[in-house]
Each structure stands twice: as C-alpha cells, then as structure tokens.
Regions:
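Conserved catalytic core of two-metal-ion nucleotidyltransferases
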Residues: 1-31, 38
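Short acidic (Asp/Glu) and glycine-rich catalytic loops that position anionic groups and cofactors
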Residues: 3, 33-34, 86-89
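Alpha-helix capping at helix-to-loop junctions
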Residues: 18, 25-32, 56-63, 67
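Conserved nucleotidyltransferase catalytic core and NTase-mimicking acidic/glycine-rich helix/loop elements
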Residues: 40, 45-167
Length: 167
C-alpha cells in the first residue's frame, strides 16, 4: 500500500508517468478520496520514460547475456526475473497510441502485437516458462535473447518515432 498526498502526486506525474499510469490502472481505493481517478498523465512524459526504460532493458539483457557466459540458470533467471518489468512500458505504449489498457498480461501482449503488427511471442514464452517453472535448453535461451533483442529494438524505434501532437 502507498500513502501519498495530492501535492506529491501532482509534483511527481512528469517524473514517474509510467508508475502513476500503472497505479491508476490497478489501484484499489481502501478509504477516502480517489486522488488517482482524475490525474492527467502527459504523453510527452510517457514517451520519454518508455524510451528510456526500453533502452535500459535492452542494455540489461545484452550485459546479462554476456555476463552469464552461457549459464542456463543465470539466463533463465534474468529473462524470467525481468518479465514483469516490461508491462509498465507496454501499458505506456498502448496509452501513447490511445489504446485500451488491459490488466491481464496475455491481453497486454496481444494488444501491443495488434497495435504494431509484430510478434511478441517471446514474452508469452517467458510467461509460460515462469508459470511452469521449466528450464529451457541453451539453444532455446539463445533464441529468447535474439527475439527479445529484435522486439525491444523495434519497440524502441516505434516509441522514438511517436510524435506528440500539440493540444
């Protein structure tokens, strides 16, 4: 649970737009006024944070892939461990393009796939590995890395090319 004042939220929206977008999407009000209901999240702020986060994730998987030196357990842990961190960016991308923001992870993946006509099956594969606690082969992990790299590169370009239209 988080406790925040309206002033704190207002002063933090441009710094943490993805976090507030996620909170607005999934929060449950326990008591008092719903201060997240009418917050205004700027597309320019979301675009910037999405690009920064996606580029950071691309660096992370590249560095992690090299650092793991073929260790299947380390690679699996890195890929599966970082999985949930992609969904705020996916929500941000959908927000930028005025799409519905699904809560269920499979639906989020499908929405981004449909938006850009790209294959995000690698994320579905990672969800499957996580839910079934499986241990992929070295070849499968190499394919996962290559697919993640290509998908992230494509998403970064899409976000980078997104134009903020004046109000």
């Amino acid at each position: 649970p988080l406790i925040m004042t309206r002033d704190y939220i207002d002063r933090s929206l441009e710094v943490f737009p993805l976090e507030f977008l996620e909170m607005k999407l999934i929060h449950q009000l326990v008591y008092g006024e719903d201060v997240l209901k009418n917050i205004s999240i700027g597309k320019a702020d979301v675009r910037l944070q999405c690009e920064r986060e996606l580029k950071g994730k691309l660096q992370h998987i590249c560095q992690g892939y090299i650092k793991a030196m073929g260790n299947k357990s380390a690679l699996t842990d890195m890929f599966v461990g970082s999985l949930s961190g992609y969904f705020p960016e996916f929500h941000g991308i959908l927000f930028l393009f005025d799409q519905k923001l699904p809560k269920e992870k499979g639906a989020v993946i499908s929405a981004v796939e449909n938006l850009f006509d790209i294959d995000l099956g690698v994320y579905k594969k990672l969800l499957e590995i996580k839910s079934q606690d499986t241990h992929p082969s070295a070849e499968s992990l190499k394919e996962i890395f290559e697919k993640l790299y290509r998908v992230l590169d494509t998403l970064i370009k899409k976000v980078d090319e997104f134009e903020i239209k004046p109000a």
